[in-house]
From Swiss-Prot:
Belongs to the rhamnose mutarotase family. Gene3D superfamilies: 3.30.70.100. This is L-rhamnose mutarotase. Pathway: Carbohydrate metabolism; L-rhamnose metabolism. It comes from Flavobacterium johnsoniae (strain ATCC 17061 / DSM 2064 / JCM 8514 / BCRC 14874 / CCUG 350202 / NBRC 14942 / NCIMB 11054 / UW101).
Length: 107
């Protein structure tokens, strides 16, 4: 993806649910991965700090990526509901996220 924007953020899995978080992502719905790709997300990884439960997400976004459009999609909301019992979430069940500032990059 040319002119991709790197995006990094943190989330938090509830204590004791780290394995379940991994299982659910191992079984991610194919239609959700298609939606993420079609929305302009690629090269997406999530890492877990096992001591703190902090999740570190990093992804590349197309220049035309529209977060509000993805956030309002019924399938995205269904996934959030599916994950809400094991993550720290906002009132709409979206995961609580903390955007990170890039301070170094090497191609």
């Amino acid at each position: 993806m040319e002119n991709a924007i790197r995006n990094a953020f943190t989330m938090k899995v509830k204590s004791g649910f780290e394995t379940e978080y991994k299982i659910r992502h191992d079984q991610i719905w194919p239609e959700l991965t298609a939606l993420l790709s079609e929305s302009g997300i690629c090269d997406y990884s999530i890492f877990l700090d096992e001591e703190t439960g902090i999740l570190f997400g990093v992804q590349k976004l197309s220049s035309g990526f529209d977060r509000s459009q993805l956030s309002s999609h019924p399938l995205m909301r269904k996934w959030w509901n599916h994950m809400s019992d094991i993550m720290e979430t906002n009132p709409d069940n979206s995961p609580k996220t903390n955007s990170l500032k890039e301070v170094f990059h090497l191609d």
